[in-house]
């Protein structure tokens, strides 16, 4: 079609200097600097569907900026490679322009705080890394019924766990220790009235579990020991009753 394909310089029959290449529709695809046949530095554009990736190499290894673009012209991901490995700050975005995540890398390993967002710009995760090893995690998940916030340590639930209704009121809250429920857990109705209160030790119910109806009247008490029911007390219309 008459479109230029490439321009190359030679010295003593060897590639030397700048080599430039274009696609059939005239888009730049390569700028490669040669030294007597050996590629020193490379700038490459790889077209994938309607988007594309810009990357750099030095002495055959990824080195320098790396940028991925959406078809709409917005950035998808950007960062830097050092000696073939991710280094420094990396950031990604959704196609609508909202930030997706940002993270720091050292020698190809995530280090420090990794932060993630959903496509509406709301925080979904904060994860602390130490050279690729996860130290602590904070997550918030959302669905039609509401949202859940929780923490992890060493890969298991550890710390406060909270469930929220879609109207913003709390549904349930308590603590995890090393993957097991611990201490006092409380639950609420959507109206914000108390639903239950329960105690846990090593993931098992302990002490007195109390329950209320949606009008705020206590309806039940159950005593537990090591997860086993010891006594159950139901409140009936006249205010008393055992079972």
What label would you give each PLM region?
Residues 1-243:
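Glycine/tyrosine- and acidic-biased, solvent-exposed loop/turn segments at the edges of beta-strands
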